[in-house]
A protein has these predicted regions:
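Short edge-strand/loop segments of extracellular domains
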Residues: 59-64, 116
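Intrinsically disordered, low-complexity Pro/Gly/Ser/Thr-rich segments with frequent PxxP/GP/PP motifs
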Residues: 62-96
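C-terminal interaction-tip segments
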Residues: 1-36, 101-116
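Beta-strand signatures of extracellular beta-sandwich domains
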Residues: 55-59, 110-112
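Short solvent-exposed strand-capping/beta-turn motif centered on an Asx-Ser/Thr pair
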Residues: 44-49, 102
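Acidic glycine-/aspartate-rich tracts in secreted/extracellular proteins
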Residues: 47-50, 61-63
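Short, solvent-exposed loop/turn segments enriched in Ser/Thr/Gly
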Residues: 35-41, 90-93
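Hydrophobic beta-strand residues in large extracellular and virion-surface proteins
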Residues: 28, 54-56, 97
Length: 116
């Protein structure tokens, strides 16, 4: 399936990944080989009793998580809050989404989308 064949209503979104990142960048999701992927939504839930910062990266194959590929860099998430990014993101085969949290394992990140 090419990117042109994706539409926001072509298939129900499904959970692609769910992780609780630590203070070092952790792979959340990697688009499989020979696939194109669409991320429909990223949910960030702060399950900690205080504010925590998150950083989320979109990496091409062979890249490492740095400030130059951060989609969100040290974004503060208040306690008991869910941040929702529902803007579509398109990944090529081997592209990776990684994340870290300032307080380690105090947020849950859930990724919804489609592999085509």
């Amino acid at each position: 399936m090419s990117y042109n064949e994706f539409s926001r209503t072509s298939a129900p979104r499904r959970r692609l990944a769910q992780v609780s990142p630590s203070t070092t960048a952790l792979r959340i999701y990697q688009c499989p080989a020979n696939k194109a992927c669409r991320i429909d939504a990223i949910y960030v839930s702060n399950i900690h009793s205080g504010v925590t910062d998150i950083t989320i990266h979109h990496l091409a194959p062979g890249e490492t998580a740095t400030t130059s590929n951060a989609m969100y860099y040290q974004v503060s998430v208040p306690k008991n809050t869910v941040l929702i990014d529902d803007a579509p993101k398109y990944l090529l085969a081997g592209d990776t989404i990684m994340a870290s949290s300032s307080t380690g394992a105090h947020v849950v990140i859930t990724v919804y989308g489609e592999e085509g």
